[in-house]
């Protein structure tokens, strides 16, 4: 029997008198086939360390611990710590850290692995309400995660992996794909969770690029420009640029110069620009004095 078997999950929750907290976005997976598929997608073996976020009662952790060198699981809910000590008691390669991953000193934490030099992967069922902040925190942390295989709301997975000229494409697609490739591996129906969420989930596989997709003069400014492109999705890039930077004649002259330098038509919509085009635009805007 597995932790994720519905009867075991129910028994664990009842034994510990656990009640779900909506504020933590808790939905526990009760399908062992899907858990195995997650581990297979992440290609977990004894040559890698794994960071898990939000282990819940340890359903995914059990599968990870059986396959990885070591697992470090971050759990924010104090009430789950004694439950995890119970469900994972047979494993000596799991560390449960009772901390908010967003407030954790990850550089120090990963030194606590027995072999911290092994490749590092993130495998997690992320809380819906805080998926994007967690992902961006990890991606921007400068820790050399090899890849992420994470479950999230299907709509968010579609946005992260979206291509230009699609409804889902936006500044989040650009922010992630600048650092990583992103592809939806498979869909997880809402019916396999306790309690069932309102929408289906997706497993997103993200692999870190050896270098960012493009080279830009100023990364922060590049991400700012990418956000500007999507201020009003149905309006032109020119409208969005003037909405953000201003509409004085001097500013409009500079914007025209930058668009010419970047070889981008002002009438294009932000959702049609590729990441390299946003990079060219950001560098051109810098060059003309923004």
From Swiss-Prot:
<keyword id="KW-0694">RNA-binding</keyword>
<dbReference type="GO" id="GO:0052908">
    <property type="term" value="F:16S rRNA (adenine(1518)-N(6)/adenine(1519)-N(6))-dimethyltransferase activity"/>
</dbReference>
<dbReference type="GO" id="GO:0005829">
    <property type="term" value="C:cytosol"/>
</dbReference>
<feature type="binding site">
    <location>
        <position position="29"/>
    </location>
    <ligand>
        <name>S-adenosyl-L-methionine</name>
    </ligand>
</feature>
<comment type="function">
    <text>Specifically dimethylates two adjacent adenosines (A1518 and A1519) in the loop of a conserved hairpin near the 3'-end of 16S rRNA in the 30S particle. May play a critical role in biogenesis of 30S subunits.</text>
</comment>
<feature type="binding site">
    <location>
        <position position="54"/>
    </location>
    <ligand>
        <name>S-adenosyl-L-methionine</name>
    </ligand>
</feature>
<feature type="binding site">
    <location>
        <position position="100"/>
    </location>
    <ligand>
        <name>S-adenosyl-L-methionine</name>
    </ligand>
</feature>
<keyword id="KW-0489">Methyltransferase</keyword>
<dbReference type="Pfam" id="PF00398">
    <property type="entry name" value="RrnaAD"/>
</dbReference>
<keyword id="KW-0808">Transferase</keyword>
<feature type="binding site">
    <location>
        <position position="125"/>
    </location>
    <ligand>
        <name>S-adenosyl-L-methionine</name>
    </ligand>
</feature>
<feature type="binding site">
    <location>
        <position position="75"/>
    </location>
    <ligand>
        <name>S-adenosyl-L-methionine</name>
    </ligand>
</feature>
<dbReference type="InterPro" id="IPR023165">
    <property type="entry name" value="rRNA_Ade_diMease-like_C"/>
</dbReference>
<keyword id="KW-0949">S-adenosyl-L-methionine</keyword>
<dbReference type="GO" id="GO:0003723">
    <property type="term" value="F:RNA binding"/>
</dbReference>
<dbReference type="InterPro" id="IPR001737">
    <property type="entry name" value="KsgA/Erm"/>
</dbReference>
<feature type="binding site">
    <location>
        <position position="27"/>
    </location>
    <ligand>
        <name>S-adenosyl-L-methionine</name>
    </ligand>
</feature>
<dbReference type="InterPro" id="IPR011530">
    <property type="entry name" value="rRNA_adenine_dimethylase"/>
</dbReference>
<dbReference type="InterPro" id="IPR029063">
    <property type="entry name" value="SAM-dependent_MTases_sf"/>
</dbReference>
<keyword id="KW-0963">Cytoplasm</keyword>
<protein>
    <recommendedName>
        <fullName>Ribosomal RNA small subunit methyltransferase A</fullName>
        <ecNumber>2.1.1.182</ecNumber>
    </recommendedName>
</protein>
<keyword id="KW-0698">rRNA processing</keyword>
<comment type="similarity">
    <text>Belongs to the class I-like SAM-binding methyltransferase superfamily. rRNA adenine N(6)-methyltransferase family. RsmA subfamily.</text>
</comment>
<dbReference type="InterPro" id="IPR020598">
    <property type="entry name" value="rRNA_Ade_methylase_Trfase_N"/>
</dbReference>
<dbReference type="InterPro" id="IPR020596">
    <property type="entry name" value="rRNA_Ade_Mease_Trfase_CS"/>
</dbReference>
């Amino acid at each position: 029997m597995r932790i994720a078997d519905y009867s075991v999950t129910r028994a664990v929750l009842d034994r510990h008198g656990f009640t779900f907290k909506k504020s933590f976005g808790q939905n526990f997976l009760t399908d062992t086939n899907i858990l195995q598929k997650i581990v297979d997608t992440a290609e977990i073996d004894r040559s890698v360390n794994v960071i898990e976020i939000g282990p819940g009662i340890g359903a995914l952790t059990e599968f990870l611990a059986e396959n990885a060198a070591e697992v470090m699981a971050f759990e924010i809910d104090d009430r789950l710590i004694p439950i995890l000590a119970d469900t994972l008691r047979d494993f000596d390669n799991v560390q449960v850290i009772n901390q908010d991953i967003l407030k954790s000193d990850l550089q120090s934490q990963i030194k606590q692995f027995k072999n911290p030099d092994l490749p590092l992967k993130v495998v997690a069922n992320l809380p819906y309400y805080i998926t994007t902040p967690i992902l961006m925190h990890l991606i921007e942390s400068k820790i050399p995660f090899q890849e992420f295989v994470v479950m999230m709301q299907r709509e968010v997975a579609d946005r992260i992996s979206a291509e230009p000229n699609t409804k889902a494409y936006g500044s989040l697609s650009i922010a992630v794909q600048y650092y990583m490739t992103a592809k939806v591996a498979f869909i997880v129906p809402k019916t396999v969770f306790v309690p069932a969420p309102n929408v289906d989930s997706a497993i997103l596989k993200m692999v870190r690029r050896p270098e960012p997709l493009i080279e830009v003069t100023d990364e922060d400014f590049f991400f700012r420009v990418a956000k500007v492109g999507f201020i009003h999705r149905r309006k032109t890039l020119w409208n969005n640029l003037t909405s953000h930077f201003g509409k004085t004649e001097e500013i409009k002259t500079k914007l025209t110069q930058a668009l010419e330098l970047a070889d981008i038509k002002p009438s294009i919509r932000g959702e049609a620009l590729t990441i390299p085009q946003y990079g060219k635009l950001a560098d051109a805007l810098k060059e003309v004095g923004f």
